[in-house]
């Protein structure tokens, strides 16, 4: 079976960032000019294109770590396609800026920048520490994620990212990420609950097999994501599970079986029971 998964190389030099095997280059100064930075700010460039799993329609993700977010008036002199608040709604007044979006030249690449304060980073670290201390000695199911999607993105993008301003401060902060604890918590979050297996038993016995196929498929995807976390992956978005599995070194039998089952269809009763 040929895995229809594409990866690419990215490079970061002293002056520019090159993505998609050299097809597109973005000057570092362009990213610096688009961000609102003060002397203490840390500018991080990151995202799936930096990882090498993004496509020509993916985005460059930037994080600006700051003491305080800029307000709308502060960034008036910089042209952006979108400026949004914490709920990603367009800003219409002089509010705090949480995110900006820009489109790079005549490419399909867009650049997303999130403003995150240093106290918020510390709160994320604390959340991970507390969650780990609470679950590391028991077997409870985690029905709700510990971190929000934004908080997970901050951790992941900090781990794979590169600093374009205040690199020393970034390296210090990065060294304090409780990475192994974060990975363990992520692993526990994705483990399927026993009640889902009971649903599968019910579907099997009643003949509700299309539903049963969907439940076991969801369980397989979650278990696979959990597995990728244990290998060191911190990208938690569903859509990257194939790329994450593809890039894992070793475990060829597990990877091969996953790719077959993930792409396998089932319509008839025999096919559905075989799949389940």
Task: Enumerate the predicted regions with their spans.
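Short, solvent-exposed loop/turn segments at secondary-structure junctions
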Residues: 50-51, 118-119, 234-235
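Active-site-adjacent loop/helix micro-motif of nuclease/hydrolase catalytic cores
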Residues: 71-75, 122-125
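Helical scaffold of the NTase/Pol beta-like nucleotidyltransferase catalytic core
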Residues: 1-45
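Active-site nucleotide-donor binding segment shared across nucleotidyl transfer reactions
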Residues: 30-73
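Short amphipathic alpha-helices in soluble, non-transmembrane regions
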Residues: 75-84
């Amino acid at each position: 079976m040929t895995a229809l998964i594409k990866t690419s190389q990215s490079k970061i030099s002293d002056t520019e960032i090159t993505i998609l095997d050299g097809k597109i280059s973005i000057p570092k100064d362009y990213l610096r000019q688009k961000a609102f930075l003060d002397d203490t700010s840390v500018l991080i460039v990151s995202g799936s294109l930096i990882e090498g799993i993004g496509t020509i329609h993916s985005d460059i993700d930037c994080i600006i770590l700051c003491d305080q977010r800029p307000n709308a008036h502060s960034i008036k002199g910089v042209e952006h396609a979108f400026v949004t608040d914490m709920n990603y709604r367009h800003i219409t007044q002089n509010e705090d800026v949480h995110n900006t979006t820009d489109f790079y030249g005549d490419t399909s690449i867009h650049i997303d920048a999130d403003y995150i304060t240093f106290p918020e980073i510390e709160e994320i670290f604390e959340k991970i520490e507390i969650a780990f201390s609470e679950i590391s000695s028991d077997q409870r199911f985690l029905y709700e994620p510990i971190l929000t999607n934004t908080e997970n993105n901050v951790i992941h993008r900090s781990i794979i990212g590169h600093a374009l301003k205040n690199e020393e401060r970034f390296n210090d902060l990065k060294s304090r990420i409780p990475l192994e604890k974060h990975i363990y918590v992520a692993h526990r979050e994705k483990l399927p609950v026993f009640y889902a297996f009971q649903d599968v038993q019910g579907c099997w016995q009643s003949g509700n097999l299309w539903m049963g196929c969907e439940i076991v498929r969801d369980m397989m995807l979650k278990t696979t994501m959990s597995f990728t976390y244990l290998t060191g992956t911190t990208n938690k978005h569903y859509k990257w599970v194939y790329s994450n599995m593809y890039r894992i070194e070793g475990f060829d039998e597990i990877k091969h079986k996953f790719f077959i089952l993930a792409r396998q269809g089932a319509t008839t009763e025999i096919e559905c029971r075989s799949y389940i």
